[in-house]
A protein has these predicted regions:
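Intrinsically disordered, low-complexity proline-rich regions
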Residues: 16, 23-26, 31-34
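Glycine/serine-rich anion-binding loops at beta->alpha junctions
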Residues: 60, 107-131, 265, 273-288
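Short, positively charged and aromatic/hydrophobic N-terminal segments
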Residues: 26, 38-41
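N-terminal, positively charged, Ser/Thr/Ala/Gly-biased leader segments
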Residues: 45-62
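Acidic, low-complexity central loop/insert segments
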Residues: 82, 103, 110-240, 292-346
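Conserved phosphate-donor
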Residues: 88-106, 235-273, 302-325, 329
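Short alpha-helix boundary/capping segments
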Residues: 1-10
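Cationic, low-complexity basic patches in intrinsically disordered or flexible, solvent-exposed regions
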Residues: 9, 20, 39
Length: 348
């Protein structure tokens, strides 16, 4: 028996065996159905809250947008992947329920194409969402809030610092210890982005670096080369990526988009992921390790900028700890603002 109550968008499927005389079956069936519809109509439909936040910015509609789904325990990996495609952001975060007062949360990150082990701007957005919904709170004495996010490949530490006035709290993410991967031939890589060897900073190697997610690092000569870059052959990028050791390419140069910045970057993707990411936290961590390790920056603390030419200006604070040859930690910091709140139907 199927019934639809269109006035409240309630869909009911009833599978039961009723053994009654034919003369009474219709009456009992309709009575049962009316009662069931009234019962369901009076019950609130369970829903999963979600938020859309902009990370690495203090202003809405800047930085990098991220969807965060809360209370996501019951969602299967397949459903999470479908929802990530539905939201169609560079990443979507799924946060499981935690006991009240807990500072540890199970979190997973999905792009429209796949699950990934670590991501920067979803981490910032996730913590901002937890603060906004009251699941965590800053200590009353003004000390930082320390959280643990249990990700696909293990836990990471997040420190939340109160800020002065109405500015959102500053979220610091400690990424994995850097791993320096393969060196790539410029003649194989640069044509994919419409570039030539002259567009590289002289002496700079093209290298895979991971602080949780392996990214291909390309240090270009200047802003002009960076702005000239584009994915000239998406299929070639997809083939090269599939045969290599990196998730996505990160192109950058020294000198910020504004006077306060020290680096400027762009980050490209392959379908069904978005074509260009506005502000990429995980790759910024890998970039920081690359720059410090190879001696391209004098200070381990700097400001990274990205997204300005897309109308999505974002700012990432960066801290690298340890000597150039043995980096101990890489941290990225940023703020996030809530743009949208809503709910998902629980039967997904």
């Amino acid at each position: 028996m199927n019934a639809k109550a269109s006035s409240k968008s309630i869909f009911i499927q009833v599978n039961t065996k009723i053994q009654l005389a034919p003369s009474r079956l219709r009456f009992v069936g309709l009575s049962f159905l009316r009662g069931l519809i009234q019962y369901v109509a009076l019950r609130p439909m369970p829903q999963l809250p979600f938020l859309l936040l902009d990370a690495f910015t203090t202003q809405p509609l800047r930085g990098n947008p991220c969807a965060v789904v809360l209370d996501a325990d019951a969602l299967t990996p397949a459903t999470r992947q479908q929802l990530a495609r539905e939201f169609n952001q560079s990443e979507t975060a799924f946060v499981n329920r935690a006991t009240p007062g807990s500072t540890e949360f199970v979190v997973r990150f999905f792009t429209p194409a796949e699950e990934i082990p670590l991501a920067g701007h979803p981490t910032i957005a996730t913590v901002a969402a937890l603060l906004h919904t009251g699941q965590v709170a800053l200590p009353a004495d003004g000390t930082p809030l320390v959280l643990t996010l249990d990700l696909l490949h293990g836990p990471i530490r997040v420190d939340v610092q109160p800020t002065i006035g109405s500015e959102p709290p500053l979220v610091w993410m400690t990424q994995r210890r850097p791993v320096f991967g393969a060196i790539h031939a410029p003649e194989d890589v640069l044509p994919i982005f419409g570039l030539t060897p002259d567009d590289l900073l002289p002496g700079a190697s093209i290298q895979t670096v991971s602080t949780g997610t392996p990214q291909l690092m390309l240090l270009l000569r200047d802003h002009a080369a960076l702005r000239r870059a584009y994915v000239a052959d998406p299929e070639a990028l997809g083939r090269y990526r599939a045969a290599s050791d990196f998730f996505s390419p990160h192109l950058f140069c020294l000198g910020g988009a504004t006077p306060t910045g020290h680096t400027f970057a762009r980050h490209f993707g392959t379908p069904p992921d978005i074509s260009e990411d506005p502000v990429t936290g995980s790759a910024t961590g890998g970039m920081a390790a690359y720059l410090w390790h190879h001696g391209y920056i004098n200070s381990p603390n700097f400001i990274a900028e990205q997204g300005h030419d897309m109308g999505r200006a974002g700012t990432v604070q960066v801290r690298v700890s340890g000597p150039r040859t043995a980096i101990e930690t890489v941290q990225i910091g940023g703020t996030a603002v809530v743009v949208l709140e809503g709910s998902l139907r629980a039967e997904l």
